[in-house]
Every structure is written in structure tokens, then in C-alpha cells.
Amino acid sequence: MSVAENKSEENDIKTPVLDRKNDYPSLFCGKTINFVRVCINNTGKYKRQKRYKQEYKKENHMNERLIVKSFGPVKDLDIIFKKVTLFIGDQGTGKSCVAKLFSTFKWLEKVLSQKKYKLSYFEQYNRFKTKLCAYHRIDSFIVNGNPYIKFEGELYDFLYENGNFCVTDKGQDIKGISKVMYVPAERSIVSVAENKSKLLKELPDSSETFSEEFVNAKKFFQSGYNLPFEGLRFEYDSLNDTGWIHGANYKVRLTNASSGIQSSLPMCIVSEFLSSKVSDKEEIKLSKEEKDKLEKRVAEIMQNDEYSDSIKDMMIRQLSYANRYNQLINIVEEPELNLFPRSQMEVLKSLVCNNASSDENMLVFTTHSPYSLAIVNTMIMGAKAYANASAGQRRLIENILPVKYQINEEDIAAYRLSSSDASYCQSAINPNTGLVSKNELDSASGDIMRIFNSLYQCYAKTLAR
């Protein structure tokens, strides 16, 4: 087949031709289109590798799978991540460990898709332990025991087995770059530390990264930020590097605010800041070296006469996607920290709203709070009611719980982790109702009430004497 014939066939795909007025900068926008991947053989002819249907569809990353055995507190689990995924369980059952592994693999997918590292880099010299797991300080779990870890992602599969780490490229076209944010339980420290950099350096690397984003978020909301509860407002004095909380009749420095404010403000403001970056399809900041490489690659594509215009357009689109955010992976430890139940609801509504700002976003959180589960059930029920309602009923539902705070039941996964070997990880979703199981909501209160009733019976006997 001649090159001319091949060009004609490729043009039959009817790929939208991009605006070339400003060369490649104008290409860095829009939704993804899968393209025909080609390579040139020794004779200069095209060799087709894969041909993808050109269609817009919901992405498959909402069903990413994690399998873990014998990794620290994590005994044996096989789970699917969805748009909203939550973990509940006692202390020390591995909720945070699972969340940190997910964060690690999503970050790894990100940097590999940007071609910042070769696949072999992380496969060699035990870097999975010393670089990746050490970032979250879960590297010690590899020393003890012989863990098995497998993550089936959108773009790559990762496997750690018998001390070896293996990465497999699934050959998928990228749709954009993820902004992966791990919000640690220690986040209140960034509120009280403010500019005490030495204190922050003692934290895990993940906490230091979160602290940096908190600084960026404070600067972004220079005119102020409204907390989702109690009518409170945060204002940042950049000149003196000081945060202030404004209430109805008072003003207090963030360092002197309540523990609930200190833990929730960094989480909420960073989540909203990053979700806005993703919604705006913000370009990733590149170093001069990275910009030079990008410009060189674009020039190579545009000057190659063997590529048809449609192929050039699609190849440059792929370059654009590798440098533009398209989703926020927001991983939050215990969003309810130090908050009254009513405030817990407002904080969760804020997180869910930010998550809903893009179809690609994902929210993962751990919790100890039965109130959080009840709130999630309210959000699921809101979506179920809205889906079946008439126009008039929908207006009523919107007044009770707006759509931006609702969660479709097919978009949520919930898992209970326990200390029992036999039932370590179980789904907390009732398959009949699509809601978080009533047992998960009532287990703690049931234990408390049983103790109360026993004590009340003892008390009643003392009165009968």
C-alpha cells in the first residue's frame, strides 16, 4: 500500500481537523478522541498497530481493581474502585493503607503516561519499596511477610509478587492527566504550623505535598473562602503569611481556631482549589527542558510529510492530553475529624460537590463515623428519588438535596474492613437497596445500647432495695 493510499484510508476515519491558526498551542484543549496508532517501518510505509472506534463514552477507570494479600494490616482483599469509594472499620484494620496504595498506583500511572520515567525505572533496585511505598511510609510492610499486590488501572497494570515489581503498559491512549491528592489525617498540622517549615519537614512526604497545595489554595482564594459550615469565612493575609477565621461576631487566627476548623479548612479549600484546576482543564506547568522537548516533538510531527493532516492532528491531541489535567483523584482520611454531625454533613457535601464537577473525578475516603455513612445514604437516596421523579417532584427534591450533592448508586463502592481473618473485607452496600447496610450504621450504637441497658438494669435493682 502506498503512502498516498494510506492517507486516503486514514482520512476516511473523519477525524475533526483542528484549528491551525496558532499552530500547536491551539490544540491543547477539548475532549479526547482515540486515534489510529501507526509507526513507520524500514521502507517508510505505514504499519497499522491498532484502530480504535472514534466515539465519546464513559471511561473505564471507574472500575479499577486492587488485590492485596499480607501487606501490613491488610490481610486479603479484592476490591473495585468507583467514582465514590469509602472504607469503614476499626482502627488498625488497614483503611489508610489501602487508600495509600491506591494513591501510589494512580500517581504512578500519571508519571508513566507523561513519559517522565521508563517502566523499568520502578521495576529495578527495589524502588517500589524505597521510592513509592516510602512516600507514604508504608515501606516497612514489605519487610514483614511476603505481600502480594496487584492493581489493574486504566492505563497500566502493576504487580508486586515475591519481591519483584512488574509494570505492564495496557496500550491505551491517554485522556488527560490526573491530579492525585492525598489528604492526610494529620492535615490540622498545616493549619497550626503556617510558616514553620521545619515542623512540616518532619511529616511524611505526602503531608508535605498536601501542605504545598494548601499554600497554593490560600493564594488562589486571595479574596477569601467560605467554609461549608457555620457561616465561617477564611481570609489569608499574604503579606504576613497569616490565616484568619471570620465568624458572625468574631475574628480569630487560624492557629487559634477550633480543632474542627483546623482539620476541615485545609481539606475543603485544597479540594475546591484542585477541582477548579481540573474543571478549567488547566495545563501542567512544565520546566524549560520539558517545554523544549514538547516543542521539538510537535515540530517533528508537523514537518513529517508522510503523516496526513488527520494523523498529525490526532498525534498532537495526544501530546496535549499529556499536559492537561482532566481529573482529580481526591483521597481523604477521615473527613469527619473533630466535627459535629451537622458539620460532617456539610463537609461531605462539599467533597461530593467537587467530585461531581467532572465525570472523571474520583473521591476515596476512610471513616470511623456512622454519621458519615448515614449522610452517604441520604445522598444515594436523593439520586434514587430524583431518577424516578416527575418534573414537579424533582423541584421538591432539589430543594431538599440539590443534584450536585447526590450520588448515583452505580457510582459508589463501600467496604468494611475488620480484624477477622474470615471476613476481613466485605462490601458494605446492601445489594437489595443500593444503600450502605443498616448493620454498618447500627453496629456501634447497638453495642453502646446493650451496655446501657445492662447498666440500667443494675441501676433499677439498686432502686428496688
Task: State where each predicted segment sits.
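Conserved hydrophobic alpha-helix in the ABC-type ATPase nucleotide-binding domain
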Residues: E346-L348
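P-loop NTPase switch/coupling surface
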Residues: M1-V3, K14, R20, P25, ...
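Conserved H-loop
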Residues: M362-Y371
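Conserved D-loop-proximal element of ABC-family nucleotide-binding domains
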Residues: F340-P341
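Extended helical coiled-coil dimerization/tether regions that scaffold
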Residues: E152, M181-Y325
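Walker B catalytic acidic pair
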Residues: E333-E334
